[in-house]
Structures are given as C-alpha cells and as structure tokens.
Amino acid sequence: MFSESDLKRLVEEVLVEMTTKEGANIKDTPVSQPTPTVVDEDGIIPDITEVDIRTNLLVDNPENAEEYLKMKKHTPARIGVGKAGTRYKTETILRFRADHAAAQDAVFTDVDEKILEEMNLETIQTMCSSKDEFITRPDLGRKISKEELSKLSSYKKNAQVQIYVSDGLSSKAVEANVKNILPALIQGLEGYGISVGKPFFVKLGRVGAMDVISEEFGADVTCVLIGERPGLVTAESMSAYIAYKGTVGMPESRRTVVSNIHKGGTPAVEAGAYIADIIKLMLEKKASGLDLKL
C-alpha cells in the first residue's frame, strides 16, 4: 500500500522527469531557418488565353486523336478538355475563369482614350451616367441629350452616310477592331463615290442611339460600329448595325446587321469592305433590314 506522501513523491518525480526530457528535446532540436523567397524578375508567366483551344487536345490517350483534332478545328467550343477523375482538369478550369474574367472586363472597362485620339474621334455620351446605369437602364443608352449633340454642331450634316463608333457591351471590341475596320469602310465608300460624314464616338451607347443620330445628321444611311456582348469564346467581337433613313421608334426589322467581326470570325478589314458593299446597295434600293434583299 502506498501512503499519501508516497503518491505525492511519485507524482513529483514523474513531473520532474517529464520537464527534464522536454527541456533536453528543445535544446537538441535545431531551429529551422525560414527559406527566402526567390523572385525571378525576368520570368514570364504564360498567358493561358493565348493557347488556341482549337488545337489544344487535353484528353489522355484518345482513341483517335487525329479525328478529335479535326473536329476541334471547326469550333471554338470546349470539347476534348479531358477529366481528372470526375472533375475538369486544372488547365480547363483556369481557361474558363480567364475567359470569363476577360468578358467581364470588356463590359466594365472604358475604351482607351489614346485610341480615340489617334483615330480623331470626338466623344459624346448618352444619358447614362455610369457603367452600372448603362447595364441596368438600357433605355438611357438609346438617348442623347441636346447638350451632348451640340458638341458635334460643326460636323457636316446630310451626307449620304454617317458612321460612328460606340462601346456598347464591349470596349475591347472597339480597341481590337476600330483601327482596321473604320479606314477600310470609309475607303470603300469613297471608292464608290459616296459622301461620308466625319465619324465620332458615342460612349455608353446602345444600338437604338443610332436612331437619334440618324435624325440629328439627316444622312441617308447611318452605320454604327458597336461592341457585342462578350462571351467565353471572345470578348473582342464587333457588329455593324446599318439603317436607311432611320427614325426614333422604328422597328428593329429595319436594321441590317453584320456581326462576329473579330480575328476569329470575319476580319475587321474584310468586314469594312463588305459593309461598304451593303451600304452601296442600300442607297441603290433605298431600303434596309428585311426590306433589303442581299
């Protein structure tokens, strides 16, 4: 039998022994030094969006890789992306997120003012006061105040064709295409002997704003080069909406549209020449939209 004093002494001995061992372990254990982070200032992080989806096959051990690539060549759709177990591969997810981010940036950023200055495009703004209002109030994106229109009072009126550029839902579309499409379009029209009014830029503009421009300038044909709503395939797609004798409140069926103007669709220079041909036909037939037989 142990007495109470014996138990106390035993507990004290155990505690002393444990403390001695812990102290020895702390002294014997080397202190790990933090590893410095090495930053390669000359290193380049590859841009995943530069990879051509049509040639990038991510399926492991495909049954027929050649036929798979032939199919991918004809579409930018996300096929042949492969799986890691039941999940998408990391590269697939990163590309999806990168493309989605690019689409968001295209909507919420403004067109680079240096490009507008370089193209000598005077800027006016619709009745939208911000990007948020532009998204939530499309009706205001179709209206332009008299004060804004007065900025263009020195511009020639009643030309055969009035062209202008607008950001629409993609500022990136304007930045990527306007330098090529606008000169090609004007050159094509002037080559046909068609008079063209001086182009300008409408900020926060919807397609319907072209009707206000049509009435203000009195041109026979009005053409707006506007950024399309971006998607996961491209954020740089532009469209041309063209109308003969446009008026505020006219039906949408009176507009002719040339869409998918981007490097992966119709190239900007080619689109400019094609639009010039359409406008020439409009002036000859005095019609646009469904009334114009192309």
UniProtKB/Swiss-Prot annotation:
Assigned EC number: 4.3.1.7
Any GO BP: ethanolamine catabolic process
InterPro entries the record matches: EutC, EutC_C, EutC_N
Recorded catalytic activity of this chain's protein: ethanolamine = acetaldehyde + NH4(+)
Residues engaged in binding adenosylcob(III)alamin: V207, E228
Pathways per UniProt: Amine and polyamine degradation; ethanolamine degradation
Pfam families: EutC
Location in the cell: Bacterial microcompartment
GO MF, any single term: cobalamin binding
Signal peptide stretch: none
Required cofactor names: adenosylcob(III)alamin
GO cellular component, one term: ethanolamine degradation polyhedral organelle
Keywords on record: Bacterial microcompartment, Cobalamin, Cobalt, Lyase
Broad class of the protein's primary localization: other
Keyword Lyase (UniProt): yes
Similarity-based family: Belongs to the EutC family.
HAMAP family noted in UniProt: EutC (MF_00601)
Protein task: Catalyzes the deamination of various vicinal amino-alcohols to oxo compounds. Allows this organism to utilize ethanolamine as the sole source of nitrogen and carbon in the presence of external vitamin B12.
Assembly behavior: The basic unit is a heterodimer which dimerizes to form tetramers. The heterotetramers trimerize; 6 large subunits form a core ring with 6 small subunits projecting outwards.
Protein name: Ethanolamine ammonia-lyase small subunit
Organism: Clostridium tetani (strain Massachusetts / E88)
